[in-house]
UniProtKB/Swiss-Prot annotation:
Cited InterPro entries: Adenine_deam, Adenine_deam_C, Amidohydro-rel, Metal-dep_hydrolase_composite, Metal_Hydrolase
Coiled-coil zones: none
Family, as annotated: Belongs to the metallo-dependent hydrolases superfamily. Adenine deaminase family.
Entry keywords, A to Z: Hydrolase, Manganese
Annotated gene: ade
GO biological process: adenine catabolic process
Reaction(s) catalysed (UniProt annotation): adenine + H2O + H(+) = hypoxanthine + NH4(+)
Organism the protein comes from: Dehalococcoides mccartyi (strain ATCC BAA-2266 / KCTC 15142 / 195)
Listed EC numbers: 3.5.4.2
HAMAP family cross-referenced by the UniProt entry: Adenine_deamin
CDD domains in alphabetical order: AdeC (cd01295)
One term of GO molecular function: adenine deaminase activity
Any Pfam family matching the protein: Adenine_deam_C
Cofactors: Mn(2+)
Full protein name: Adenine deaminase
Length: 571
């Protein structure tokens, strides 16, 4: 180690050869927001210096191209890509992502610590720095049934692992406000670490209380005033632009000369199709520039700001002693990525990675569908013609509205009304064969016939389905059992399309291109059935998440998120 350090210093002083010298670069300096013409010397995976270096074992003339730090995705759930970790890395590295911070509460809610071990092990040899925020909400709440539990003792143990930066998003904000001991125990276990927040709509004294617990970020702002208040109270605002959650346009005015150091770009949840077509965090940077943000500032929000918040020493800048994670592009406004370096090695060029992804999935993660046998009649909503809560989807958002509508009944059973876009929604517990089935109605999917179903249902990932009739819903759920998890579409009792996701019912074992093609086909078929949503399965996956207002459905029933309680229903 001392030998390497001594040699690094010699290279920095110009007394020894660098491993790599990049000539004639226009270096994006994230410290002073300037573009600096310079050469860059790299040794041992680190940047030795920025200046007039020419002596190197390898010399590459960039001919005036821009050189910027590798991008850092400040908050994401890699499982939302539906890709095996090696394929996920293949998708994002080509788009300039050099590091990311992930909260693995998706796979953890199904498989517990074994899921975390799989991701960390599978990513160990990839040219991508993956940092973990220990999942704080496994299970997310008491209002649903998860497949595992991570308690405060587990949090303490996991925080000792390498590349663990802190405690993941505290979604159970009511648990914080009400002082639930198990919630506070996890917060105390992570004292001194980075604590991520999840506080949709919190303001005033409740916001003060939440922040006072030591939680200093939030990625759930959807209104500018909300973001301004949270920033003023000391929070870092993670400006999110994902597949279903698109908040960049609304929140970008928050970024000013006075506030930008407290702002970070994130994607939260991004589908593999969006990763392939538009990119990862680079897509957020690109869109921000198109919306008028200065390119260098946009890069700061996806590099140094993120690194400093998460205390990632050596990440996020092109400067002496920093990791040589770098991007080469010709046009900063377009962020057209030519080359990606990781620790000084060229790992992607012209959109193609230069390494071979290898998948290693434990067999124990390939069998996670444990639904108690049920009949079509078990899906019925019993009741008389009366007012009942109905979930309304808001396009482009994961928050929902609660409607109270009079629903017709036939023979003591409440029925969907396709003409009014009132469809059946069900959630079936899939972890321990409890037989729990949540039933409700939802508005906004637009299906005129058939049903869609998914074993991806944040955050406990039970099976969720929406359809025009119980028979098609039943068939779709049975298809998910057959393929060991995934998504399915059924029309007139026949399986029209399905995408297997056998790894915990969340991830595919297929290459990126095959998964994207399959998803595009099933989404196209959903549109053909009248679905109004651009990402129907991504939207469906959030309808069971009882920590996002206003109304949700879990395997235990309808949840009033604002009151944080189940809504009584007839049985």
């Amino acid at each position: 180690m001392q030998t390497n350090l001594s040699q690094l210093i010699k290279v920095a002083r110009g007394e020894a050869k660098a491993d790599l010298v990049l000539l004639n670069a226009r270096v994006v300096n994230v410290f002073n927001a300037e573009i600096e013409p310079a050469n860059v010397a790299v040794f041992g995976g680190q940047i030795a210096g920025v200046g007039d270096y020419t002596l190197g074992n390898r010399v590459l003339d960039l001919k005036g191209a821009y050189l910027l730090p590798g991008l850092i995705n400040g908050h994401t759930h890699v499982e939302s890509s539906m890709l095996d970790i090696s394929q996920y890395a293949r998708a994002v590295i080509a788009h300039g992502t050099s590091a990311l911070i992930t909260d693995l509460h998706e796979i953890s809610n199904v498989c517990g610590k074994e899921g975390i071990d799989y991701v960390l092990s599978a990513s160990a040899d990839l040219p991508l720095n993956i940092f973990l925020q220990v999942p704080s909400c496994v299970p997310a709440t008491h209002l649903e049934t998860a497949g595992a539990e991570i308690n405060s003792n587990d949090v303490t143990e996991l925080l000792r692992l390498p590349n663990v930066t802190g405690l993941g998003e505290m979604m159970n904000f009511p648990g914080v406000l009400f002082g639930i001991p198990s919630v506070l125990d996890k917060i105390e276990a992570a004292s001194g670490k980075v604590l991520d927040g999840h506080a949709p709509g919190l303001s005033g004294k409740d916001l003060n209380a939440y922040i006072s617990a030591g939680i200093h970020s939030d990625h759930e702002c959807i209104q500018l005033d909300e973001a301004k208040e949270k920033l003023a109270r000391g929070m870092y605002i993670m400006i999110r632009e994902g597949s279903s959650e698109k908040n960049l346009t609304e929140l970008l005015p928050l970024v000013t000369d006075k506030t930008y150091k407290r702002c970070i770009f994130v994607v939260d949840d991004r589908s593999c199709a969006d990763l392939q077509r538009d990119g990862d965090i680079d897509a957020v940077v690109r869109k921000a520039i198109k919306l008028g943000l200065d390119p260098v500032r946009a890069i700061q929000l996806a590099s140094i700001n993120t690194a400093e918040y998460f205390r990632l020493n050596g990440h996020g800048a092109i400067a002496p002693g920093y990791l040589a994670n770098m991007i080469v592009c010709q046009d900063l406004n377009q962020l057209d990525i030519d080359m990606v370096f990781h620790k000084g090695e060229l790992v992607a060029e012209k959109g193609q990675v230069l390494f071979k992804p290898q998948s290693h999935v434990p067999k124990s993660l390939l069998s996670s569908m444990h639904i108690k046998p049920f009949d079509i009649k078990d899906l019925a909503i019993k009741g008389s013609s009366t007012q009942m809560p109905v979930i309304e989807v808001i396009p482009g958002q994961i928050v929902t509205r609660r409607l109270n509508l009079k629903i017709p009944a036939e023979n003591g059973v409440l029925t969907p009304d396709i003409e009014q876009d009132l469809l059946k929604i069900v959630v079936l517990e899939r972890h321990c064969q409890s037989g729990n089935i949540g039933r409700g109605l939802i508005k906004g999917f637009g299906l005129k016939k058939g049903a869609i179903a998914s074993s991806v249902a944040h955050d406990s990932h039970n099976v969720i389905a929406v359809g025009t009739n119980d028979a098609d819903i039943y068939t779709a759920v049975k298809e998910l059992e057959r393929i060991n998890g995934g998504i399915a579409l059924v029309v007139d009792g026949k399986i029209s399309a399905s995408v297997p996701l056998p790894v915990a019912g969340l991830l595919s074992t297929q290459p990126l291109e095959k998964v994207v093609d399959a998803l595009e086909e099933i989404n196209k078929q959903a549109a053909g059935l009248g679905c109004k949503l651009s990402a129907p399965f991504a939207t469906l996956s959030f309808m069971a998440l009882p920590v996002i207002p206003e109304l949700r459905l879990t395997d235990l029933g309808l949840v009033d998120v604002n009151a944080f309680k189940l809504i009584p229903q007839e049985t």
